[in-house]
Amino acid sequence: MVSANGSHCPYDDSFKYTLYGCMFSMVFVLGLISNCVAIYIFICALKVRNETTTYMINLAMSDLLFVFTLPFRIFYFATRNWPFGDLLCKISVMLFYTNMYGSILFLTCISVDRFLAIVYPFKSKTLRTKRNAKIVCIAVWFTVMGGSAPAVFFQSTHSQGNNTSEACFENFPAATWKTYLSRIVIFIEIVGFFIPLILNVTCSSMVLRTLNKPVTLSRSKMNKTKVLKMIFVHLVIFCFCFVPYNINLILYSLVRTQTFVNCSVGAAVRTMYPITLCIAVSNCCFDPIVYYFTSDTIQNSIKMKSWSVRRSDSRFSEVQGTENFIQHNLQTLKNKIFDNESAI
């Protein structure tokens, strides 16, 4: 049990080391495989790339950059020692926030793009261009990197355990929370969470309303079902991954600044923080599902790959069957010749 900085409330968060180690290991394996496959399809399989694909490529790159830092985090949470230096600690922290809020903003870009394509298909043609999509992506990268810079500035390694080990990713001091971090959290939550959340819900609602209008009722039922699945998957992943962490981050900020002085509330919030963070990190594994339901080309590429694999397997089976048939006939012929020679 340790006491919160400047607080009389004891808490024990040692469980987070095991939780982080297990969760980050799983995210590393699944996230690395799924996002590498996604990048391969985007670069090698897609012959025509549109503005939506541009957002998805940047989202996959954001996921991969964060996934590459996970082995260092896994090592730290397993050994509780950071031997990789202060710079890599700062880079790992920056890529965590860059990935989380970059994912939120890129998913929002995909949602807004879908909204423009369905609700204003003709008026939005001048807006929905690959050039504009690239400009938006550059703006997103600058925004998330600028927003994560203060956290990187305050995060650094420090000695622990009688100077026998180095710590990284540990809690900031209470004084830092009161003076700087609480204001940074307000900015991050408004720009990086609440505005994107409102945009996602609003755009999805207007798309659903447009699809139910008499003018669009003539659309094929299959197309409508596909759009509904797309919206459902998008919102579920967005809300599941990011809502718990960001709501808890607000409460966590209030606890660390001692706005909440209730020990029970503080303990609950501190306990939920590592859990919600693990849920948020899992977005690296779920983002490829968004790619699948958003892009017909990706669906077709995966189906073609699986079809070609099945076809090659069937060809192999046919060849193997033919070889077995030939071998059987040769053996039969050999036996007949041997019987005839024996009779002579």
Curated annotation (Swiss-Prot):
A single Gene Ontology CC annotation of this entry is: plasma membrane
InterPro entries assigned: GPCR_Rhodpsn, GPCR_Rhodpsn_7TM
Cytoplasmic topology ranges: 47-56, 112-134, 205-230, 294-344
State one Pfam family annotation: 7tm_1
Per the UniProt record, which residue ranges are transmembrane? 26-46, 57-77, 91-111, 135-155, 184-204, 231-251, 273-293
Which regions face the Extracellular side of the membrane? 1-25, 78-90, 156-183, 252-272
Tell me the keywords, alphabetical order.
Disulfide bond, G-protein coupled receptor, Glycoprotein, Membrane, Receptor, Transducer, Transmembrane, Transmembrane helix
The similarity comment for this entry is: Belongs to the G-protein coupled receptor 1 family.
- What's the protein name? Lysophosphatidic acid receptor 6
